[in-house]
Amino acid sequence: MMIKTRFSRWLTFFTFAAAVALALPAKANTWPLPPAGSRLVGENKFHVVENDGGSLEAIAKKYNVGFLALLQANPGVDPYVPRAGSVLTIPLQTLLPDAPREGIVINIAELRLYYYPPGKNSVTVYPIGIGQLGGDTLTPTMVTTVSDKRANPTWTPTANIRARYKAQGIELPAVVPAGLDNPMGHHAIRLAAYGGVYLLHGTNADFGIGMRVSSGCIRLRDDDIKTLFSQVTPGTKVNIINTPIKVSAEPNGARLVEVHQPLSEKIDDDPQLLPITLNSAMQSFKDAAQTDAEVMQHVMDVRSGMPVDVRRHQVSPQTL
């Protein structure tokens, strides 16, 4: 009886500890920059789903990854409540985008923001939400700078946004004041391009990071935007790209390919089936003798969002 009681206490303790761990704010994923010639940073982790281990979104938040990134890395997982005992791959390893390692680089295709702090040999990777399909809500590519930043921002929704909300039975005021009901959260960083209509901002919701849910702006978890807000200054370069596939010929001989689902352009598009166009450099990478083109094509079809080695391995005659 005593053993059973003691076991029950330990079980209660570990259940509580797991719940607390999921509830704690996630730390930003900061990695040292790779050596010359490499683009690989980070390291994947594994998560064993506990009994009543929380939703997939809660697990994504714990490791500070995006919801869709976690879903793509674990095909077949229940998107709401993963099965207890299942092992999830946490996609923390990535190839740095093919863009200057300066300021903020956002790859909307992979729903990630990369921040390169000045004077430091590191990069911090944040999951983001971007503009949803339809009308003026798409997030555009651009090269711009931070023009302004503001704590406790108000929100002035556009006429189109107000009309969209009204169609859902929600009457938005002309200006939404700062506070718990403001979907911009507690911090906003304004971009100079397009007249300053696009911002990086927080959120008052627990869902939507790593998804296409915003009205065109870049959405981050509140703890992430708070950290980024404290680090960037007006004039910081911001480069927004749309690159669903990244490749790297690594110094150690690995030939890495990372493929994400391309962004849909129509509501009925299936991003898993949308074609991926290779530029000349990527086509040369695929056609190279060192690359197993069949394996690379398979990686392009699966679209796991994680780097995969597609180098061709030589078969010794003695093993034939």
From Swiss-Prot:
Task: Domain (L,D-TPase catalytic): give its ranges.
Answer: 102-241
Domain of life of the native organism:
Bacteria
Q: Which residues cross the membrane?
A: none
What broad class of enzyme is this? transferase
Q: Where in the cell is it found?
A: Periplasm
User: Active site annotated at which positions?
Assistant: H201, C217
EC? 2.-.-.-
Record has Cell wall biogenesis/degradation as a keyword: yes
Q: Which GO terms describe its molecular function?
A: glycosyltransferase activity; peptidoglycan L,D-transpeptidase activity
* Effect of disrupting the coding gene: Simultaneous disruption of erfK, ybiS, ycfS and ynhG leads to loss of covalent anchoring of the major outer membrane lipoprotein (Lpp) to the peptidoglycan. Complementation with ycfS restores some of this anchoring.
Q: Which UniProt keywords apply?
A: Cell shape, Cell wall biogenesis/degradation, Glycosyltransferase, Hydrolase, Peptidoglycan synthesis, Periplasm, Signal, Transferase
Q: Which residues form the signal peptide?
A: 1-23
Q: What is its main location?
A: periplasm
Per UniProt, residues of the LysM domain are 45-90
> Which SUPFAM superfamilies would you find in this protein's record?
L,D-transpeptidase catalytic domain-like
Xref: PROSITE patterns: LD_TPASE (PS52029), LYSM (PS51782)
One cellular component GO annotation, for this chain's record? periplasmic space
**What metabolic or biological pathway is this protein involved in?**
Cell wall biogenesis; peptidoglycan biosynthesis
InterPro entries given in the database record: LD-transpeptidase, LD_TPept_cat_dom, Ldt_C, LysM_dom, LysM_dom_sf, Transpep_catalytic_dom
Gene Ontology BP terms: cell wall organization; peptidoglycan-protein cross-linking; regulation of cell shape
Q: Does the keyword Chloroplast apply?
A: no
Q: Which family does it belong to?
A: Belongs to the YkuD family.
**Subunit organization:** Interacts with DsbG.
Q: What does this protein do?
A: Responsible, at least in part, for anchoring of the major outer membrane lipoprotein (Lpp, also known as the Braun lipoprotein) to the peptidoglycan via a meso-diaminopimelyl-L-Lys- bond on the terminal residue of Lpp.
Question: How is this protein named in the record?
Answer: Probable L,D-transpeptidase YcfS
